C-alpha cells in the first residue's frame, strides 16, 4: 500500500492511498462469500457458490463494490496509523480507480480528506514550577454562608405597608395587545428585586400596597406573543416580608447537628476552607494547561470548530442563525479554548504514554451512567451503538494524562509548595496491561450481555 500525504491546511490533509492487487484480494474473496450467502444459484447450495461463478452470475462490479466498501475504511485507518495522523472529524472519501474484472491489474486508488490535530511540541514538565494563589477563608465568607442557612429557616409574614425590594407580593397579571387580552395569571408569588419575570415588573410593584394596582409597558417573554410589547396590568393581593431567626445557640441546634452557634460557625469555616482548596485545585489545573500552551500557536480545525459553535448556539437559541453577534463571538471564543485544551491534553497523553485500561473505561462510563440513573450495561450499549466508545477512551486518556502531568509539576503559593495529592491522587504503582482494544472488547461483551437480557425480557 502506497500512501502520500498533502497538507491542505495546518489542520487538514488529503491522503492518497494506492492498494496493490494482492492487498485487495482478501476483501474481494470476503465479498464473494458474503454475496454467496444471499443469492440462489442452481446447482449450488446457498453460501457455497464458487467465487468465479459469483463473478459470472452476479457480476464482478457488485463484488468489487462490496469489497471497496469494506476495504477503504480499514485501509484508511491503517494509513492514519502509518503516517501518525490524528483525525478530528469524519473523512471525505473519493474512490478514483477500481479493478473492472478479476484479471484486471488496476490498483485500487482512493483519497481521504480529513481534519486533523496539528503537531504540538509540548515543553518538558519535569521540574516545572507553577505559582498559584493561596486559598483564603474570610470572616465575610463564613457570614455569607451563615446568612444563606438562616434564610432557609426564614418565614413569610404579612405586612401592612408598601412593597419594597426583598418582599414577596401575591399578584394578578393581565397582558393586553391593542386592547385584547393575550395572557393572564392569578395568585402569582413574586419576590421584588428578583427580576425573574417581566422587565419593568419590579419597578411597577415598588411602593404598591395590598389592594392597589398599576399598569406598565413590557415585552412578553413566552407564549405565542413572545417578544411583543404589551400593556400589563398588575394588582397586588398581599405583601409579605421575610422574617429571619436570631443567630443564637437555639438557631444552631435547630438548623444543624451542633448545640452552639460557635460550633456551627467552625463547621461552616471548615467547609469554606475545603471549597477554597477545591478552587485552588481548579486554578492549578487551568494554570497547568495554560503553561503547556505558553508560546505556542495552535490552530484549530475550521470544520470541527464550526460544528461545535453551532451546537453551542443551539443551546442558547432555537435558531442558531438568529443568534446575536455577542452570542456568536462568545461561542467561538469558548469553542476555540475548549478545542485547544483538548488537543494539548491529547498530545500530553501521548507524550506521557498514557495507557487506558478496561477498568478505566468501565469506571468512567459507569460513573456517567450513575449520574443519569441508568443501568451501566444499557448505557455502554448506547455508547457503542452511537459510535462514541472512542470518545470515551479519549476522555479517559486526557484525564489520566492531566493528572499524571500535574503530579510531575511543583505548584507553589506564596513561595510554599502546595500539596494537591488530595485532588490528584497517587500515581498507580502497577498499571493494568489492558489496552484500548481490550476496553472495546469489554464494552462489546457488555453490549452482548445487555442484548441477551433484552431477549429474555421479550420471551
From Swiss-Prot:
GO biological process: 'de novo' cotranslational protein folding; cell division; chaperone-mediated protein folding; protein transport; protein unfolding
Alphabetized Gene3D superfamilies for the sequence: 3.10.50.40, Trigger factor ribosome-binding domain, Trigger factor, C-terminal domain
Subcellular localization: Cytoplasm
EC numbers: 5.2.1.8
Highest taxon of the lineage: Bacteria
Reaction equations catalysed: [protein]-peptidylproline (omega=180) = [protein]-peptidylproline (omega=0)
GO cellular component: cytoplasm
Family matches, as PROSITE patterns: FKBP_PPIASE (PS50059)
Keywords from the UniProt entry: Cell cycle, Cell division, Chaperone, Cytoplasm, Isomerase, Rotamase
Molecular-function annotations in GO: peptidyl-prolyl cis-trans isomerase activity; protein folding chaperone; ribosome binding
Domain PPIase FKBP-type: start-end pairs: 166-245
SUPFAM superfamilies: FKBP-like, Triger factor/SurA peptide-binding domain-like, Trigger factor ribosome-binding domain
Written domain comment of the UniProt record: Consists of 3 domains; the N-terminus binds the ribosome, the middle domain has PPIase activity, while the C-terminus has intrinsic chaperone activity on its own.
Role this protein plays: Involved in protein export. Acts as a chaperone by maintaining the newly synthesized protein in an open conformation. Functions as a peptidyl-prolyl cis-trans isomerase.
Protein family: Belongs to the FKBP-type PPIase family. Tig subfamily.
Protein name: Trigger factor
Species, as recorded: Bifidobacterium longum subsp. infantis (strain ATCC 15697 / DSM 20088 / JCM 1222 / NCTC 11817 / S12)
Amino acid at each position: 500500500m502506497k500512501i502520500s500525504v498533502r497538507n491542505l491546511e495546518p489542520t487538514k490533509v488529503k491522503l492518497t492511498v494506492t492498494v496493490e492487487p494482492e492487498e485487495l484480494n482478501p476483501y474481494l474473496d470476503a465479498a464473494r462469500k458474503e454475496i454467496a450467502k444471499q443469492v440462489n444459484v442452481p446447482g449450488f447450495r446457498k453460501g457455497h457458490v464458487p467465487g468465479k461463478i459469483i463473478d459470472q452470475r452476479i457480476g464482478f462490479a457488485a463484488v468489487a463494490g462490496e469489497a471497496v466498501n469494506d476495504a477503504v475504511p480499514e485501509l484508511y485507518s491503517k494509513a492514519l496509523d502509518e503516517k501518525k495522523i490524528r483525525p478530528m472529524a469524519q473523512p471525505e472519501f473519493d474512490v478514483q480507480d477500481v479493478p473492472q474484472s478479476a484479471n484486471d491489474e488496476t490498483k485500487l486508488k482512493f483519497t481521504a480528506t480529513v481534519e486533523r490535530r496539528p503537531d504540538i511540541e509540548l515543553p518538558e514538565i519535569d521540574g516545572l514550577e507553577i505559582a498559584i494563589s493561596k486559598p483564603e477563608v474570610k470572616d465575610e465568607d463564613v457570614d455569607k454562608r451563615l446568612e444563606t442557612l438562616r434564610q432557609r429557616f426564614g418565614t413569610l409574614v404579612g405586612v401592612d405597608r408598601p412593597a419594597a425590594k426583598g418582599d414577596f407580593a401575591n399578584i394578578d397579571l393581565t397582558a393586553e395587545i391593542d386592547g385584547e387580552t393575550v395572557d393572564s395569571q392569578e395568585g402569582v408569588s413574586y419576590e421584588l428585586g428578583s427580576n425573574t419575570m417581566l422587565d419593568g415588573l419590579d419597578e411597577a410593584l415598588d411602593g404598591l400596597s395590598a389592594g392597589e394596582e398599576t399598569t406598565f409597558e413590557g415585552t412578553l417573554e413566552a407564549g405565542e406573543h413572545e417578544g411583543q410589547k404589551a400593556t400589563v396590568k398588575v394588582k397586588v393581593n398581599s405583601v409579605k416580608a421575610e422574617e429571619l431567626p436570631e443567630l443564637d445557640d437555639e438557631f444552631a441546634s435547630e438548623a444543624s447537628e451542633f448545640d452552639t452557634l460557635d460550633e456551627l460557625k467552625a463547621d461552616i469555616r471548615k467547609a469554606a476552607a475545603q471549597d477554597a482548596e477545591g478552587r485552588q485545585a481548579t486554578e492549578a489545573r487551568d494554570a497547568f494547561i495554560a503553561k503547556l500552551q505558553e508560546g505556542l500557536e495552535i490552530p484549530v480545525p475550521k470544520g470541527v470548530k464550526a460544528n461545535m459553535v453551532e451546537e453551542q448556539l443551539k443551546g442558547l437559541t432555537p435558531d442558531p442563525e438568529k443568534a446575536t453577534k455577542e452570542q456568536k463571538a462568545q461561542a467561538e471564543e469558548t469553542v476555540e479554548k475548549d478545542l485547544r485544551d483538548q488537543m494539548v491534553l491529547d498530545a500530553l497523553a501521548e507524550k506521557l504514554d498514557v495507557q487506558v485500561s478496561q477498568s478505566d473505561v468501565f469506571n468512567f462510563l459507569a460513573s456517567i451512567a450513575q449520574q443519569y440513573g441508568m443501568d451501566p450495561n444499557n448505557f455502554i450499549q448506547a455508547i457503542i451503538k452511537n459510535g462514541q466508545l472512542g470518545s470515551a477512551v479519549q476522555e479517559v486518556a486526557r484525564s489520566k494524562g492531566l493528572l499524571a502531568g500535574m503530579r510531575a509539576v511543583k505548584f507553589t503559593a506564596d513561595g510554599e509548595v502546595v500539596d494537591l495529592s488530595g485532588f490528584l491522587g497517587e500515581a498507580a504503582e502497577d498499571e493494568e496491561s489492558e489496552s484500548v482494544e481490550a476496553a472495546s472488547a469489554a464494552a462489546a461483551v457488555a453490549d452482548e450481555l445487555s442484548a441477551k437480557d433484552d431477549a429474555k425480557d421479550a420471551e
